[in-house]
């Protein structure tokens, strides 16, 4: 089976929320488990997806997306099930907490 999306992930990091969102939205994807211990995320093929070598990365027909918040927002906008639409008055609250969680809480 060919999937529109390929999620490069590891079980113990920010990839989990991406997997949960994809599952909750009912979006088919191919999970690509990375061997972080072997340095798969620093190899040339993965670095073409995410030049920082960080996990996760989502391959889409439009190119690769990285950064957890960016992936979540992109998926929500494409599949319209997990977030207020861009013209919804509640969109600002979503963005505020999405980026606070990604940039402040997750870093800690």
Predicted features along the sequence, with ranges:
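GST-like domain detector, emphasizing the conserved glutathione-binding G-site
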Residues: 1-108
